[in-house]
Every structure is written in C-alpha cells, then in structure tokens.
C-alpha cells in the first residue's frame, strides 16, 4: 500500500539567504513506494511536486538505494511524468561519499557492495578495495549477495580502527515481484562482533 498525498499548506516559508538559490528544503520526500510503486507513478504524485514548486517550497527527494545515481533516478522519474532536476535528488550513496570526504578527505574503503557504488566512491576521490588491507572505513552498500568472508574482514578491520559505515539498515528491499534481504541483517551481524557502533547514513537516521 502506497502513501496517499495530502498537503497542509500552513507551512513556514523557507528562508532564502542572500547569494544562495535555496535554503534547507521544506520537504524531504521518499521515492520508492511514495512517488511510484513498481513501474507506475502514484496518483497525483507528479501534480504534488509541481504544486510544491509552484508555491515556492523547495524539496529534496531522498532514497536508500545505492545502485542508481541521481541522474539515473531523474531519468526514471521523468519517464513516469515527474519533472525534477538531478540536484533535487539525494541517493544515500552520494550522501555516504560526501560523509567520507568530510571525515577523511580521501578515504581508503573496504567495500561490501556492488560496482556502481565503488565507481561513485572513486569518482569522489576515495580508494576502494575488496581485499583485506589497511582501511579508514568499511562501507556497507546494497549487494545481491554478501558472504561471511566479507563480514569477517569487516570485523577485523573494525578492530584495527576502521569506521564501519552502512548506507542504511533496512531489513528488506523490493526487487520486482519479490523482496530481498537488505543491509539490516548484515549490519546486525557486524554489530554483534565489534565493540563500536555502526554509522548509518540513510533514512530514517
């Protein structure tokens, strides 16, 4: 069951600072299951975003997917009738890359995740490895499969001081007509064998 859009227009107008196009977004809007379900947009979805834009309420579309770039998502939404710009979309993979830049400048990362996440991290100046070698961070992103060997490497690197960063901790994620195990069980497994906390980047955190 997908969210039905309702609006309360008694909202505070965003503050616009001199020299800046937008202030903090008035709305943070999820994408999958909110703007579309499967291959179809939700009823009134495109109209709601057009309404917000017309009323001067800036919004940011947020998603826990780490397998699509902002441009990929923008193209998908355009095909569903949504008129949005790529800079109005924040995938969790981009948020993670920016977090690593803020924390480490150029981080050495051990990655549990797919190649699209590896490419994005490298594009932002980080080094990505799937081997057990010195690392600043263990990054856990979406992957069809993760094995105990990777979790064991992550454990040892964490014990050596690497920060463990998970893109989210959703228990499952939709993949067409089925659901698959998400990052939540992987994060829980790593948490059970390390002393420190896992940094979670995505929503709702």
What does each model-found stretch correspond to?
Residues 2:
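Cationic, low-complexity basic patches in intrinsically disordered or flexible, solvent-exposed regions
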């Amino acid at each position: 069951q997908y969210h039905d859009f309702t609006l309360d227009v008694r909202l505070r107008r965003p503050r616009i600072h001199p020299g800046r196009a937008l202030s903090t977004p008035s709305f943070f809007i999820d994408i999958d299951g909110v703007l579309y379900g499967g291959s179809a947009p939700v009823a009134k979805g495109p109209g709601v975003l057009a309404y917000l834009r017309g009323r001067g309420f800036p919004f940011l579309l947020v998603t826990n997917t780490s397998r699509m770039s902002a441009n990929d998502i923008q193209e998908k939404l355009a095909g569903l009738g949504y008129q949005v710009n790529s800079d109005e979309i924040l995938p969790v993979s981009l948020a993670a890359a920016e977090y690593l830049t803020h924390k480490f400048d150029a981080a050495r990362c051990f990655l549990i995740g797919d190649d699209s996440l590896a490419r994005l991290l490298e594009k932002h100046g980080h080094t990505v490895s799937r081997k057990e070698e010195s690392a600043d961070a263990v990054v856990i992103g979406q992957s069809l499969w993760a094995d105990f060997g990777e979790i064991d490497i992550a454990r040892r690197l964490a014990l050596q001081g690497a920060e463990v960063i998970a893109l989210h901790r959703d228990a499952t994620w939709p993949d067409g007509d089925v659901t698959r195990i998400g990052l939540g069980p992987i994060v829980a497994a790593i948490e059970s064998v390390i002393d420190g906390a896992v940094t979670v980047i995505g929503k709702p955190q």
